[in-house]
């Protein structure tokens, strides 16, 4: 059974809005299915905790709904290993062409609930794969679409090589 790692205290995983301000719970972006978008003007910061690092190879973002006004269009994803390190640019995106899909999910009683429209996209990370513990998704303000000062996100999936320390 899936459990959101940001809601399991012992995992050490944390999700926050980069500037501390936003609507909805930022941890929702790690849910298997998130029925609402989280909104922010700054971006999302994901910390895997002190025991894990990830060599990111691919990632998927999901946004709920069919209205693209607040969808991410121009943004970057960055990573770093430690709090004091500079952010490394992993990828930058402009005018993203999202794929519209229907996301089906099931209620507590096992009944299928009406499919929800969402937009998803998966990208690969090019170049040298370095280990990172913290990731952030940040809107590019210099190319922000007119009338969209905030951005929404319903889910993120990170793929790659996870490093777990040896506790011997």
Describe the residue ranges of each PLM region:
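Disordered, acidic Ser/Thr/Pro-rich linker "stalks" and the adjacent N-terminal cap
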Residues: 1-52, 67-69, 164-168
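A short beta-strand element within beta-rich, extracytoplasmic domains
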Residues: 53-66
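Short, surface-exposed beta-strand/strand-loop-strand elements in extracellular ectodomains
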Residues: 68-83
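Solvent-exposed serine/threonine-rich low-complexity stretches and specific carbohydrate-binding patches
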Residues: 89-112
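Short beta-strand-plus-loop segments that form exposed binding edges in beta-rich domains
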Residues: 137-149
